[in-house]
Design a protein with these regions (language model features):
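Short, basic/aromatic recognition patches
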Residues: 1, 5, 75-121, 159, ...
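Juxtadomain coupling helices with adjacent low-complexity linkers
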Residues: 104, 131-168
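Residues at helix C-cap/C′ positions in short coil/turn segments immediately following an alpha-helix
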Residues: 6, 16, 102, 131-133
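Short clusters of small/polar residues that mark proteolytic maturation junctions
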Residues: 25-27, 112, 136
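Sensor-regulatory modules in signal-transduction proteins
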Residues: 124-127
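Amphipathic alpha-helical effector-binding/dimerization core
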Residues: 1-77
Length: 168
């Protein structure tokens, strides 16, 4: 439904240790180059793909859902790998970002996993209110600015996450 409405690509993701795992995908053909005339995103992530949690919007949403003590255990002694020049690798900065995600209840991450790409994520909660997954949309910076993502896609992501809630 989200893809039909927006022509964007969406994923559902879960936390597995220090990584996030894509467990569902919906979207356009992501293998086409981002530089192509169609503007379709070259973001070749597939079902089962694993990414470091600290570099993704989904990972940050899922880390923000952890109790503080559990997040501290997750972070303690961890090397935060750099994937781009924009990747946060400092534990204090990551902690600050996670606090902001907790306050906002969503995360927008720009160019931390891949240059020219940003992603917006929201938590997916079960009926007990526990975050069990994150739902995201990924787009090229040039085609879909952050303000547009927040204005147009954030309400759709929140609505979709709320629709999923009774099913999990």
């Amino acid at each position: 439904r989200l893809t039909a409405l927006t022509q964007e690509s969406f994923s559902a993701v879960v936390l597995d240790g220090h990584e996030v795992v894509i467990v569902a995908r919906s979207g356009i053909d992501l293998r086409v180059s981002a530089a192509s005339a169609s503007g379709v995103l070259a973001y070749g992530l597939h079902l089962g793909a694993r990414l470091p949690a600290h570099v993704t919007s989904t990972g940050r949403v899922l880390l923000a859902a952890l109790p503080e003590t559990e997040f501290n255990r997750w972070l303690k002694g961890r090397t935060l790998s750099r994937l781009t020049a924009h990747t946060i690798t400092d534990a204090k900065r990551l902690r600050d970002v996670i606090e902001q995600v907790r306050a906002d209840d969503y995360c927008l991450a720009s160019e931390e996993h891949e240059l020219g790409i940003h992603a917006l994520s929201v938590p997916v909660r079960n009926l007990q209110g526990k975050t069990v997954a994150a739902l995201n949309v990924v787009a090229p910076l040039g085609r879909l600015p952050a303000t547009m993502m927040r204005q147009t896609l954030l309400p759709l992501l929140i609505e979709a996450a709320n629709e999923i809630r009774p099913l999990i």
